[in-house]
Amino acid sequence: PTLCCNLSCSYCYLGKQTTEAALKLDAQRAVQTLRHTLDALKAAGVLAFNVSLHGGEVTTLPPPVLDALFTMIRAHYLEHFDAHNALGHKKSAPHIKTNLFKFAPLYELFDRHKVSISASIDLPLSLHARHRTTRGGTDWLPRTLDNIRLLARYPHAKKISATLSSEHLADIPALVHDIWYLHRELGFDMNQFNLMFAFGSELNRAAKGEAVLTPCTPAQQQALYDALTAEFMGTELEEGLKRNWFDEFKPSYCTNAPNCGERFYLLQSDGAVYSCVR
C-alpha cells in the first residue's frame, strides 16, 4: 500500500523511493484501491486467494487505514471461504511484511485482526545494527530484540526472515549462533524462519553508492547450506531447515523466471500493477 519506509537498509532494492513516497497520498487511496481491485477481480471471475500487504513498510500507514485494510481482507476471505477451501487455500487473516519498528504500539490492532506477521531482520545480529538502521542512521537493535520477544508471545501466525548479502555470510558461525540465540534466549520458534538473498539493484546503487552490499556468491550460498545442515540436522530446528528456511527458492513459491505472473502480482496504492513483488 505504500513504498514509504522508516528504515534505511543498506541493501534495499527500492532505493530512494522509500523516502520520496507520498505517504499521505498513499494513506488516502490505499483502501479504495484495494476495494476497486477486489471488486474488479470478482467481476472478472478471478479468485484472489492470498492478499498480503508489503512495502516499503506497511506500518508507516496510520492505524485507521491499516484497520480498514485488515477489515476488508478478512471480509474477502470470509466471503469466499468455501471456494478457497475447495482449492486448498487456508488463508483467513491478513498478512503483512514488517520490519517490526512499530510492532509494539500496533500489537493490539494486529491481535484483533489475527494478522499473520513476517518480520524482517538481519543476521548476524551485529549486521542488523550496521545495515538495518533508521533513516537517520541510528542503530535500533535493542528495540528489535524487545519486539522479537513480543513477537514470540504473539498468538497468531508469525515468522522471521533475513536477507543475506556477501557481507552477511562473512561470518557464518556468528549467523548460526544468532539463530540459536533467537530460538533459545528470546523464545522465538526459529522453525518459522525464511532465508532470502539480496540481489543487485540499480535503484539501490543510486541511493547507496559505494555503501551498497554485494550479492552472495554461489560458493557462499553452498557454504551456508552446508553449515546449517551440519548444525541443525538432528535438532529441534531440523524441521525448519527442511521445510521453511529455503522455502522462497522452491517452485511452489517462486519460479525464478522474469515476469512469470504465475502466483503473485504487485498492486501499488496508485493502481499500478507489476508482475512480481520483486
Walk through the language-model features, giving the residues of each.
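Conserved alpha-helical substructure of the radical SAM core
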Residues: 1-96, 101-105, 113
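Non-cysteine beta-strand/loop elements that form the S-adenosyl-L-methionine
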Residues: 106, 110-125, 191-200
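Short beta->alpha transition motifs characteristic of CBS
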Residues: 276-278
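Hydrophobic faces of well-ordered beta-strands that scaffold small-molecule active sites
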Residues: 49-53, 94-96, 117-119, 158-162, ...
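Active-site cores of enzymes that catalyze phosphoryl transfer or operate on phosphate-rich substrates
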Residues: 4-5, 120, 144
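Radical SAM enzyme [4Fe-4S]-AdoMet core and its adjacent flexible, acidic
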Residues: 126-145, 149-261, 266-270
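Short, surface-exposed basic-aromatic patches at helix termini and helix-loop junctions that form
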Residues: 71, 108-116, 136, 177-184
